[in-house]
């Protein structure tokens, strides 16, 4: 824990004379003098300049690099008279939207090329550039790490829906989509979750996860290619290719033919090949850093789905009634490649002293309840969450099956270490 936060999007940011922020800061300091106090201001162009920023130790600014400030707002904040002792950070940034594995998206999905933002948000690149220009700003908290239930912008069908999608889509097309959305909502909602996460609701990383990995871990050799390379309907057509890497240059190959090198320029954070004529086969990206090979990645056109693969995050489960094992289920072709477009109906079951706690697939439009063991994979992935019966021991047997793909099974050892006593903490 590094900061105490006393609020977010608080009304007092417009009225610093009310004194509530100062009072809350003093209360926190009374009990903890070791950690600074902050809050998240949703309108930093006002709150960071009107005295509210002086009521906390560290000023949190939401979307300050975008519409609520601007590309040089952090500089204005840092250089304002009286701010010499202040520090600040981006308490909410970006809010870019995407659906995992969707690039030319189906209805009510958002493209994973990571170029769609709400009108009040921005792209990750925008925040990265502002932080690079003003390194005295401490960093950022991206909205959000995970998708979450509710708030399915841009498909929330409210009065601001036409403002919620700042992509290259005309207002006429959005209006048509809104009218269609109203018809569909007579029978069911369109989405259950947000699209903001860099990780989907099932815990599977989206492409954007790797953009942040490249940014936040420059010492970690990595390269990530998007999109997948299964595009039978796009032979001879343009399919843009993006690469995220912690390297400073990348060379892209299609079926061993070089498509050229790209160099990371100041305030640029993606390597882009916007005009790639699709042909099946293999994409390969080789990243370099300081002139030396840094990382390599391959993406291949896959064959048909033939089997399932189960990957648990661990193999021993405590029987304390709370411990969980998350089993990633992927679909493979005959060569062992994951098929990124496969969406078979998958069923999970257990025998032994345990249960299926939940299943998921990361699809924001899937309304199947979490406790149901049967659901389709979404863009090649399915999740089973397994739990042991309280106080049990022995072995739990998990079976996952899909029509035409057979079944896969794993054994999970249950460890009974005795139930921990739990106490209420009091003064």
Residue ranges and their predicted role:
Residues 1-264, 271-292:
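Extended substrate-binding grooves/exosites of carbohydrate-active enzymes
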Residues 263-264, 306-309, 349-365, 418-423:
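Short aromatic-acidic-glycine turn motif
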Residues 241-245, 286, 322-340, 346, ...:
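Beta-strand-rich structural segments
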Residues 257-259, 341-362, 372, 410-412:
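Short, well-ordered beta-strand segments
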Residues 272-278, 372-390:
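Short, hydrophobic beta-strand segments
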Residues 288-290, 401-405:
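Beta-strand-rich extracellular modules
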Residues 214-240, 251, 300-326, 332-339, ...:
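Short S/T/G/P-enriched beta-strand
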Residues 278-282, 322-324, 391-395:
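Extracellular Ig-like/FN3 beta-sandwich strand-entry sites
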């Amino acid at each position: 824990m590094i900061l105490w936060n006393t609020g977010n999007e608080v009304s007092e940011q417009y009225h610093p004379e009310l004194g509530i922020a100062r009072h809350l800061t003093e209360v926190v300091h009374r009990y903890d003098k070791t950690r600074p106090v902050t809050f998240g201001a949703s309108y930093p162009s006002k709150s960071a300049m009107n005295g509210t920023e002086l009521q906390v130790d560290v000023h949190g600014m939401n979307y300050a690099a975008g519409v609520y400030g601007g590309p040089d707002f952090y500089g204005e904040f840092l250089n304002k008279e009286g701010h010499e002792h202040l520090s600040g950070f981006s308490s909410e940034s970006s809010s870019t939207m995407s659906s995992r594995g969707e690039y030319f998206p189906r209805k009510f999905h958002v493209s994973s090329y990571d170029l769609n933002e709400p009108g009040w948000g921005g792209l990750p690149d925008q925040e990265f550039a502002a932080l690079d220009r003003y390194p005295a700003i401490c960093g950022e908290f991206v909205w959000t790490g995970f998708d979450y239930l509710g708030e399915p912008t841009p498909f929330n069908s409210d009065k601001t829906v036409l403002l919620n999608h700042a992509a290259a889509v005309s207002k006429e097309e959005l209006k048509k989509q809104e009218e269609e959305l109203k018809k569909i909502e007579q029978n069911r909602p369109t989405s259950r979750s947000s699209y903001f996460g860099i990780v989907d609701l099932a815990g599977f990383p989206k492409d954007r996860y790797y953009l942040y990995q490249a940014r936040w871990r420059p010492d970690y050799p990595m390269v990530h290619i998007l999109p997948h390379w299964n595009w039978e309907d796009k032979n001879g057509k343009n399919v843009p290719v993006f690469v995220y890497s912690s390297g400073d240059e990348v060379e892209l190959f299609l079926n061993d033919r070089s498509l050229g090198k790209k160099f990371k320029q100041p305030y640029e954070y993606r390597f882009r090949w916007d005009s790639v004529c699709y042909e099946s086969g293999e994409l390969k990206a080789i990243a370099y850093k300081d002139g030396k090979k840094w990382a390599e990645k391959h993406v291949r056109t896959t064959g048909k789905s033939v089997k399932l693969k189960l990957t648990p995050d661990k193999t021993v489960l405590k029987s304390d009634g709370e411990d969980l094992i998350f089993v990633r289920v992927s679909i493979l072709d005959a060569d062992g490649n994951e098929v990124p477009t496969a969406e078979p109906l998958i069923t999970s079951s257990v025998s032994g002293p345990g249960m299926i706690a939940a299943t998921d697939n990361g699809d924001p439009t899937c309304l199947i309840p979490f406790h149901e063991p049967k659901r389709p994979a979404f863009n090649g992935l399915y999740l089973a969450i397994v739990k042991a019966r309280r106080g049990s021991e022995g072995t739990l047997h998990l079976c996952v099956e899909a029509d035409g793909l057979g079944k896969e099974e794993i054994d999970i050892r249950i460890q009974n270490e005795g139930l921990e006593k739990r106490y209420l903490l009091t003064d």
